[in-house]
Regions:
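Conserved N-terminal phosphate-binding loop of PLP-dependent enzymes in the Aspartate aminotransferase
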Residues: 1-414
Length: 414
């Protein structure tokens, strides 16, 4: 039976705001009329071109025909919410088959699912803390390893362990909450275009960052379990790193029996022109976190590396777990999304269209060098800098008024 909605569009924010902070976008989304990359505003009967994609989580836009075609099945599945860690079904097994075929990289065969990208990151960290601590015990050391090295301008989440990592330009997201004082390292981000001077500055910062990491390890013997980095720092400013730097991280991890985490919550599932952003690089992680475009969140880990500890968290019951073991309906939605990605070759499409977008942004930067700079990107994950935060915000508001939704990042980037 079709549900009748008796709340008018002009009363939506008022109704929501009675109990929830309703200070988001100034439109009311029409769920049924939104389509592709277009959001439909029920208040004004106006369409907005969506270039924020629900904070990088809308994998194939809105009301994709294939998902709409399967909506009756998806709705039927949504009636129940099984606890997947202990209760299994044919539908769950089929999701995992598609997930394995389309998404899981050869080097990361262990999987763990949970609700929320932050918890994906946190459980990646827990897996590393456990692994390194047990490594210490094997050597006769009684030292528990509970330190995670991370980088400036990182965003890894808003709760638990991740609060000790997040340090982007908006302090409201982490200030006054209790945190661990873990080593925070200079992020040697690239500046574009990559001129001789810019590259020299980047290499100098890379060397400094690697020295800072080695010093942190020396000051905390056997206590550092992991290094975590976003392959592209998203909210921190769409900051890119050289393969040479990531290889430096890989070397330090290998030399010190430390695990390397790549946080792929925002960079994963094709947006960079590869399924995972780390696949652009020679350096490989031991474990990644995922979420957003994957609908369900979690981690993928290197089985060979973690199996150096026989009772690692992926083999010992209840070391990492949650009631629902992910989210059943999110998994099934993502199953359909993966089938669309596969059938329509959308990862390659992101690479091709992303190349066009980046070249267009570079052309704008050349045409208006006093207004736009530092054009950068991989695939469709692109950004530019404005001269100041105020000018960035003004442009963002003007674009919204013209019917385009885009997000800020870093201090002055779009």
């Amino acid at each position: 039976m079709e549900q009748t909605l008796d709340i008018k569009a002009n009363k939506v924010k008022e109704t929501v705001g009675r109990h929830v902070l309703a200070d988001g976008f100034d439109f009311v989304m029409d769920i049924e009329k939104s389509h592709g990359s277009w959001l439909y505003d029920k208040q004004t009967d106006r369409e907005y071109l969506d270039m924020f994609s629900m904070f990088a989580s809308a994998s194939v836009g809105y009301n994709h025909p294939y998902l709409v075609e399967r909506s009756e099945w998806l709705g039927k599945m949504a009636v129940n919410k099984p606890t997947l860690a202990d209760v299994y079904s044919e539908e769950y097994a089929h999701f995992l088959e598609v997930f394995e075929r389309v998404v899981i990289p050869e080097e990361l065969q262990y999987a763990f699912f949970i609700e929320g990208g932050t918890l994906g990151v946190e459980n990646a960290m827990k897996a590393c803390f456990d692994w390194k601590t047990r490594k210490n015990f094997e050597k006769g050391l009684q030292t528990e390893a509970g330190i995670c090295i991370h980088f400036k301008q990182a965003f890894h989440g808003r709760s638990g362990y991740t609060l000790s990592l997040t340090n982007t330009s908006d302090p409201r997201k982490y200030q006054y909450f209790p945190m661990f004082n873990w080593p925070r390292i200079l992020n040697p981000k690239l500046k574009f275009p990559i001129t001789e001077d810019n590259l020299e500055e980047t290499i100098k910062n890379e060397n400094l960052a690697l020295v800072q990491i080695e010093e942190a390890i020396l000051m905390n013997p056997d206590k550092v379990a992991c290094i975590i980095i976003e392959p592209i720092q998203a909210e921190g400013g769409d900051n890119h790193f050289r393969d040479e730097f990531l290889l430096g991280l890989r070397r330090i991890c290998d030399d010190n029996e430390i695990l390397l985490i790549f946080d792929e919550v925002q960079t994963g599932i094709g947006i960079t022109g590869k399924m995972w952003a780390f696949q652009h690089f020679t350096a490989k992680p031991d474990i990644i976190s995922f979420g957003k475009k994957a609908q369900v969140c979690g981690v993928l880990a290197n089985k060979e590396k973690f199996d150096q500890i026989p009772n690692n968290v992926f083999r010992e019951s209840s070391r990492i777990n949650s009631t629902f073991g992910g989210n059943f309906i999110d998994m099934l939605r993502f199953q359909l999304v993966m089938e669309v990605i596969e059938k329509e070759n959308l990862v390659e499409n992101a690479r091709v269209v992303g190349d066009f977008l980046l070249e267009s942004l570079k052309a704008l930067a050349e045409k208006y060098p006093e207004k736009i700079s530092n054009a950068r990107g991989r695939g469709l994950m692109c950004a530019v800098d404005l001269p100041s935060a105020a000018q960035r915000n003004h442009l963002m508001n003007e674009l919204f008024n013209d019917g385009l939704i885009i997000l800020p990042c870093g201090d002055q980037s779009l």
